[in-house]
């Protein structure tokens, strides 16, 4: 593709030439936007050309964005600081143990016992407790649903272990149990009855 000037008829004036020739465009603006291809001088050096073509705009700095004086910044931070002070990050305490995604969350007595402020709840802790009570209802329902299949699984493992010990130590009876792959879950990953018999 070529540039627009190559496609323009000879008699027509291109947009760049019209912008350069127009007296309104003498300040470096093109279609209402300032051109930034090196035509403008840096603001730090000497006088800059007037933005609107008038000398009044260059002298007036009331519309320019200025940094706030330090006293106003301190006042603004002073307003925010009291709000941030009571919102200290606190450790979340669970009143009831629950399971979420197979993980068990239980209250740790060591953390709660050493802290004297934990024995007398403050207003914020009471509000947090009310908010957590609402969220605990949803997690408790999820925990019950997750706990039922997991609680049945350890009972089944216990039944298999007791059946294996009652039947005896024969290799023929241990064969079917060894053929069934069992996946250990969580802290109950002790030796399975089949592996215990093989070790003997």
From Swiss-Prot:
One of its GO terms (molecular function) is actin binding. It is found in: Cytoplasm, Cytoskeleton; Cell membrane. Residues 1-200 are annotated as: Disordered. A lipid is attached at residue 2 (N-myristoyl glycine). Changing residue 183 to A: Complete loss of MAPK-mediated phosphorylation. In neurons, induces the generation of large, flat lamellipodial protrusions. GO terms for biological process: cell population proliferation; positive regulation of cell population proliferation. The keyword Aminoacyl-tRNA synthetase does not apply. It comes from the Eukaryota. Residues 74-85 have a biased composition (Basic and acidic residues). The modification Phosphothreonine is found at residues 14, 85, 148, 170, 183, 192. Residues 86-98 have a biased composition (Basic residues). Expressed at high levels in brain cortex and hippocampus, including dentate gyrus, anterior olfactory nucleus, primary olfactory cortex, entorhinal cortex, medial preoptic area and dorsomedial hypothalamic nucleus (at protein level). Expressed in neuronal cells (at protein level). Detected in the retina. Strongly expressed in testis and uterus; expressed at lower levels in cerebellum, cerebrum, adipose tissue, spleen, kidney, thyroid, liver, lung, skeletal muscle and heart. Detected in T-cells and B-cells. The modification Phosphoserine is found at residues 22, 36, 48, 71, 93, 101, 104, 119-120, 132, 135, 151, 162, 165. It is a lipid-anchor. Phosphorylated. Phosphorylation at Ser-120 and Thr-183 is non-redundantly catalyzed by MAPK8 in vivo. Phosphorylation at Thr-148 is preferentially catalyzed by MAPK8 in vivo, but this modification can also be catalyzed by other kinases in the absence of MAPK8. May be phosphorylated by protein kinase C, which disrupts the interaction with calmodulin. The keyword Membrane applies. PROSITE patterns: MARCKS_1, MARCKS_2. Belongs to the MARCKS family. Binds to filamentous actin (F-actin), but not to monomeric G-actin, independently of its phosphorylation status. Interacts with calmodulin. This is MARCKS-related protein.
